[in-house]
Amino acid sequence: MGLLTGKTAIVTGAARGIGKAIALKFAAEGANVAFTDLVIDENGLNTEKEIAAFGVKAKGYASNAANFEDTEKVVNQIKEEFGSIDILVNNAGITKDGLMMRMSEAQWDAVIAVNLKSAFNFIHACTPIMMRQKSGSIINMASVVGVHGNAGQCNYSASKAGMIGLAKSIAQELGSRGIRANAIAPGFIITDMTNQL
């Protein structure tokens, strides 16, 4: 019996990379796992199979985490299909690096939308469910660059700093209702995304 037996976790951006590793670890601990990614392609289908191999319920959902309406729909669908939402991991993220003086508004907006707005979207959609359950755990995957900054990554750094502040604020708002919120700020991890840097 694992630490998360009977719990349902949502992990955003989990078809590969850090999100996939988190989803697999949760499944190994007995959690049912719903995960999202922009598309559920061969990577997503393979991830779904790998999660299910632990004997838990697993399903990947194609969803644009940066879109408020998409997020509300997918969270409601997950609640209907899984019965509860106990854990939310806001992991969806992208990079579009460049020096400030060369960065376009589109580069800035894309990173803030996927990395930070998506966390707001999912927290906003999951909070009423967790409040009715009187329990829940929200985890924002931030980054060490959200604490220290990094040249050429002002958009990414700002988005990750925002995720840290968001977690702190949500913890204060929802802690008395049995809902925890934390941010994790890892250093550089080799993934498909970082291989493109």
For the regions a protein language model found, what residue spans apply to each?
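The beta1-alpha1 cofactor-binding region of Rossmann-like NAD(H)/NADP(H)-dependent oxidoreductases
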Residues: 41, 62-74, 105
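Substrate-binding pocket helix/loop in short-chain dehydrogenase/reductase
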Residues: 99-100, 107-112
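Alpha-helical segment proximal to the catalytic Tyr-Lys
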Residues: 128, 172-176
